[in-house]
Amino acid sequence: MATCIWLRSCGARRLGSTFPGCRLRPRAGGLVPASGPAPGPAQLRCYAGRLAGLSAALLRTDSFVGGRWLPAAATFPVQDPASGAALGMVADCGVREARAAVRAAYEAFCRWREVSAKERSSLLRKWYNLMIQNKDDLARIITAESGKPLKEAHGEILYSAFFLEWFSEEARRVYGDIIHTPAKDRRALVLKQPIGVAAVITPWNFPSAMITRKVGAALAAGCTVVVKPAEDTPFSALALAELASQAGIPSGVYNVIPCSRKNAKEVGEAICTDPLVSKISFTGSTTTGKILLHHAANSVKRVSMELGGLAPFIVFDSANVDQAVAGAMASKFRNTGQTCVCSNQFLVQRGIHDAFVKAFAEAMKKNLRVGNGFEEGTTQGPLINEKAVEKVEKQVNDAVSKGATVVTGGKRHQLGKNFFEPTLLCNVTQDMLCTHEETFGPLAPVIKFDTEEEAIAIANAADVGLAGYFYSQDPAQIWRVAEQLEVGMVGVNEGLISSVECPFGGVKQSGLGREGSKYGIDEYLELKYVCYGGL
């Protein structure tokens, strides 16, 4: 009992600076908000009231291994990207903690795989219900650690929870097969069995949804997981762990090992090379994905990867301009351009080019508002860090130096070092960085083209192929282009394509496998053929 109280006290001390207006003090059974004025500068205190009522149980700073909250030997700071201020100190796990988490997950797997599909389904449903009950607090955590506008954070929490709901239902639909063989005295059976422990490595841009999309499928299949969240956004993963525990998910089934950027490489290598891990699921950059593939190759592990993209957004002459602009706004500026399926280059046919650029610029000026994610009306929050801002800035400067024209935006925003103005460029050519390097920011470069063949050639020149979009009112053209685009997902007259019911993934160097949909659970299942003779 003394140990438990000490752990809670450690958590309280660490969270004393966590989230403005939500200072915590220990008490038996958990953490409660402390009284007194909100700490920190006025820039942070301006939204302190929105966090003051946050559930203390969801503000976790330790690792979650084997059903227990465990501190690490060191901690690392998590920063608010809007102000740069430290939100709190989180356990900085290393190789030792990573291996302990894998061991806990393996021991739990030996029990979890025997749990009936109906019971697994019920537990995932309880987890989903708890997410819905706590959706406001979970959304505020996302906004605090990622800068995402609160309205979008609420949307992510619902999207995230829906994966648990979906896979709670899919858990009961894992069917095998019977194959008739030429021999009359034999029967062939095909069983689907859970693959084992899955190492799950997730990004910062969707700190909740990228976890449940993977973990929901894994747990539904009968696998257990070790989650290494992005160092920028560990609080969401830890809050999910608390709710998983409350839902009755057995100890060791869901484990979380946060770590700093300094430790990320060795922790990632430790869990991906551990012989007790059978599966690796990763969302992140193509460069990191290739490193993890190398780790997986040494022991031939199953791998799912959702990597970088360079999504083309094509507007043909037959397109409805207003519809295309609405799709462009949704596709490009969600999460301030920091999504893997954001349109990266806009290919606009000559006949409609000027009308589209004019309408797009007007829509940007009218509808986009840069600000702190907690401020009502904000549509564009900060980028995750200054390095991300520098990348956008570099691409804009490169394009302008080579002849591109800034229609609107084009520079850092006065709000702070992590803010950049929503930017529209025209007169863009294919020799510019922004056309062959993923931006991950609020930059929309427009390339003028003449023929359908030219647009397809530009779009397919990339060595990645996650998503693509195009707008056309020509039925024959729609079929041709949809089939010819070398991407895993296509939006036809639609800028928002993600859905829990549909398979998410790419081709070429954008990844392996699919997540979500009825196909997502197959990534965590092995096929076993059983030949039954002597009948």
UniProtKB/Swiss-Prot annotation:
Q: Which GO terms describe its molecular function?
A: identical protein binding; succinate-semialdehyde dehydrogenase (NAD+) activity
Which parts of the sequence carry N6-succinyllysine? Answer: 126, 135, 184, 265, 402
Residues of the active site: 306 (proton acceptor), 340 (nucleophile)
Q: Where is this site: Transition state stabilizer?
A: 205
Name any GO cellular component annotation: mitochondrial matrix
Outcome of mutating residue 382 to L, per the record? In SSADHD; 2% of activity
Q: What is the effect of changing residue 237 to S?
A: 65% of activity
Enzymatic class: oxidoreductase
- Pathway it works in: Amino-acid degradation; 4-aminobutanoate degradation
Report the locations given in the UniProt record.
Answer: Mitochondrion
NAD recorded as keyword:
yes
Q: Which Pfam families does the record associate with it?
A: Aldedh (PF00171)
Q: Which reaction does it catalyse?
A: succinate semialdehyde + NAD(+) + H2O = succinate + NADH + 2 H(+)
Q: Which residues form a coiled coil?
A: none
What positions does the entry give for substrate binding?
Answer: 213, 334, 498
Question: How is the quaternary structure described?
Answer: Homotetramer.
Q: What is known about what this protein does?
A: Catalyzes one step in the degradation of the inhibitory neurotransmitter gamma-aminobutyric acid (GABA).
Q: What is this protein called?
A: Succinate-semialdehyde dehydrogenase, mitochondrial
